Amino acid sequence: GSEMCIRDRQVNMFRGSANSLLRNDGYHFIFLGTFIERADNSARLLDVKYFVLLPTADYIGGNLDNLQWIILLRSLSSFRAFRWAYEGDVTSSKIAHFFILNNDCSRSLSFCINNIVYHLNSLKCSPEKITDIYSGLKKVHSSVKTENIESIIDYGLHEYVTNFVSNITYLDSQIQNHFFK
């Protein structure tokens, strides 16, 4: 009800304010945090769907599995975007590709990492100061650049996402240690 309207209005006010800021370090830190959090949350939701929600492996590819994938798309406000991006049947591998490797999906891990790279590179600080940050970022960035969805699924989606979350958490702690301590 009204609490939702108030929250939505506050979110929109923040977005409007953030998008009208000077493109200085404050702006880049806001969006650096935004994309780190978005990547972490998207990865965790993908992992929960894939690893936790399905009762047993026997259900993979069945009606319950497909319904849960569609619910994941809707929960991330991405169902329509997915349908525009992919033709044919809604499959788990297409949805995994959409949320991991699709650079046009604002919720995808790849999109988030590309924006993290952009905002980190835009900070006005000496490159030596952020060398450690780049080493952590390199791991995460290369995983969304060099992989294809088949190799991720063969490796194990849960394992891939778990590694991604670990790497993004490490990156976040490196940024905190270098800039805020």
Where are each of the predicted segments found?
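Alpha-helical transmembrane segments and their helix-helix packing motifs
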Residues: 2, 6-181
